[in-house]
Amino acid sequence: MPPPQHPPNYYAPRRSISTITGPNRRDVDAFYQNNFPEKNGGSSGEHVPEYQASGQQHRPSIMSGQSHQNNHLPTKNYSYEPLRFSPPNVTPPPLQFSTNTDGNRKNQRVRFNELPNYSTPNHYSVPPRKCSLAPNFFSSQNSHHMYPDQYTPRTWQNNEFMPNHQVHPYHANHQQQHPQQHWRNQAASNGNHNPMYMRKHSAGHGIEIKLDHVDNPFGNPSHDMMDVTSGQPVKSEMLSPIKMETTDPSQQIASPSFLMTSTSLLKQHLHKKSHHNVPSRKASIMALKSQLRTPRGTPLNISTVPGTELPYTPPPILAPMRNGSGLFCQIVKSANSSLPVAEQSPDAPSCSTNGVDGDMKHLMNGKKRSEDGDGPSRKNGFFYMAQQMNQTNFANELEALRKESWASTSSADEKMQTERKESLESIRKASCMSDSYYEIEEGPKISDPNPHINLGKNYQARVKKWCDRQVSTSERDAIEDRDEIVFSSEILQDIDPEQITAFELLACSQACPRAGRNKELALHLLMENKGNIEAAVEDLLRSDTLDWEHYSSVFGYMYNDSVLWTPDEIYQFQDAIYQSEKDFDKVAVELPGKSVKECVQFYYTWKKDCPDDYRKLRNLRRKRQLLDINLQKNQSEEPVVPAKKISIIESGDSDNESNATDSSFIGNGHMEFRDRAFTSPMMSSPREEPIIGLSPSSKDLFGIQKNYQPTAPRAHHTPSASASKKGAQPSADGFFHCRLCDKCFEKVKSLNAHMKSHAMKARAEQEAKAHDAQVAAAAAAQLTSAVGNVVGNPVATSPLNSFANGHLGISIPSTIGNLTPQQLTPQQLNLNQQLQTQLNSLSNQMSLNSPLTPQQQLQQFTQQHLMARAMQQNLFQPVTSTPLVQPTHPLIQAGLHSIN
């Protein structure tokens, strides 16, 4: 059979698995132009020609939008809306059967000219949509399930643009009564080409509808059609939205149970409401909001009693008895899979997607199986019901369909194309025209969206009774009452308020020997003595020797400040709290006899009773925070130079000192030079010993130096440390310490005023320093003249020489001058040359009459001292980087102090 022919202006819409559209206006116009040219031309008065032969009749296209009716589907009225994406709406009346048989089946046609021609209102238009996942043709507005496995378009409710006689007569909102219609069933004959039809007998219009014919592909289950694109034969049971049964259609019509089923299902759908301008859930998956708050179910999983209110499930919890998958769906399926099918609870949360058909059957592995097939109910975002596709290879075809949808963007295997037994286009058409294309929530509501308290044993906790019996009154009375009255104000009614005040003051005074004196203890004792204030006073005064076990309210109770603290412990606590900044673990370490809890408790008492000390702690914390901030800034800007190095650098002019000044001579242990070249006068004071071997001039010089020795130290407290910092900074303890004395101040202003007194002392010290420098210069001149005599006469003729280097504390052996160069070793010759060179340089310097500073004089004196030492030991030590050590001779000490 050749494929149906289309007019030249007919364009089949493009369809794929991702975008499926219904018949548009062009499809509907082409449909009417092809099948009803007289009606489309507006000739309502002309008669439709008689039924044509099967070879001359043009069959309507599959996707043209023509309503497909079953062989037992009558029609009542005709209404066509060109602005809707839907075919003409055909409303079926309730079925009424009769036994009247008539063999006249010649005029098997629909007389549309006998129907009233209602003009379409032009003042109402629906804006066309450009793209839609599923048009309104598949929405619940136009598809109303009246009978099982049957597709019938549905009209709108209370549509003001539709005549009243086009509304369903069974609708609840319809108020107009229609005339009673009588239907007469005319039995079918046994011939294949003698179809069964129904005739309507009415006082008004007469309609004859052909239901079953050899050329009707939608009414004949055994007839196969040709695909539009491929030309392959397509089974009509795949294309028709009506589920084809293998039984005789006449038996289904004659069955009275069919009417009861239709009526019961019709009542279940009466509660559904729709609007003509709002797409339903079928039209778009994301068109409506979530329905989880008001789920629907089947009578199998409704646990509520009829007549009671629906249970409420508060968000975000989902209703446990809802349809569809959820949080606990896998748990329920795994639990049900471990049990036989007969033992599974019917009240368990359902994971099914079809509530009308009662699809609650589960396999042993926990998966849901369909009623008519075991194919999937959803694939690649679309809902395909296996019960509509009564085939065994439906899953394979659906998988092939999914692979085909990706063929445009990826290289799919061509072998999948050859394995298909049915056309992909036919499957898409069947899915579009199928009534179960999208999942619909069926059945009554099982959850109430309005919040309320759920009543009933199913929603309340089941608490097991105590020992499975009730507690008797005697047993309740036998239970000991653990509540104990500690204090009651009734005992104060018979006591004078002045006595109570005096008693409280006594408890807080030092007359109470027990630690933790407070009013709470006094009131407890008054309660224990039952309001006898005299007995309470006696107990309070002997609280240190009282047996507290007889007082249940006082025994074992920890009162505030009940730990005794001695004054020494309080001082230790203050020092520890100042240093640790409220680190009570460290405070407890400083106080061995106290725990951390006791230290914390005493801290709040000390804070309240000693506000001045607490204010000091608060200032310390604030100053430490500022100090930390300043230290971080200084470290980020430049590295901090240690104060010790600064004092050493600024103590003297290292550029004017020679290498001999920094050398150490390893001889006797008492002549070593140490790190501290300049120490306080308390550590380097001259010893009160007679100096042996000194000349009278040397003794006088020592006496002058002793008398004019500076009293204030200058090397120990150097102003370099204060000059290195910008502004005074608090110490670690939070105080501002004076760098010249041991005084400390809380404020910077106090420290600045104190430093002014040090400045006055510094000026006086500078004047004394200048006077000491003059005296030291005179002493150095005398010393230089004495050394010059030694240089001028280097060879002494006798060890009893009057000078004999006695002022240096060294005796040069006289044998050196009597030795000849041949008798000296090479080492001695080298030493003699070096010493002679140094002595010549010293003599040249002293020959000049230029005045020398005390520091230069001390340098020359030190060199002479080293040369004399080398002559005595007959050894030469290399110059090292070790600084000079304080010598023991008082003259050198005087020179060092004069330099400072």
UniProtKB/Swiss-Prot annotation:
Identification of the protein by name = Suppressor of activated egl-4 protein 1
User: What coarse category fits the chief subcellular location reported for this protein?
Assistant: nucleus
- Where do the record's region annotations for Disordered lie? 1-75, 340-380, 406-425, 710-729
Span of zinc fingers (C2H2-type)? 736-758
Q: Which InterPro entries match?
A: ELM2_dom (IPR000949), Homeodomain-like_sf (IPR009057), SANT/Myb (IPR001005), SANT_dom (IPR017884), Trans_reg/Corepressor (IPR051066), Znf_C2H2_type (IPR013087)
Q: Which GO terms describe its biological process?
A: negative regulation of DNA-templated transcription; regulation of transcription by RNA polymerase II
Q: Fill in the subunit field for this protein.
A: May be a component of a histone deacetylase complex containing saeg-2, saeg-1 and hda-2. May interact with egl-4.
Reported tissue expression: Ubiquitously expressed.
- Domain ELM2, chain residue ranges per copy: 451-544
Keyword entries, A-Z: Coiled coil, Metal-binding, Nucleus, Repressor, Transcription, Transcription regulation, Zinc, Zinc-finger
Q: Which organism is it from?
A: Caenorhabditis elegans
Job description of the protein:
As a likely component of a histone deacetylase complex, together with saeg-2 and hda-2, functions downstream of the cAMP-dependent kinase egl-4 to regulate the expression of genes required for egg-laying and foraging.
Q: Does the keyword Phosphoprotein apply?
A: no
**Domain SANT per the UniProt entry, residue ranges:** 560-611
Key word Metal-binding present = yes
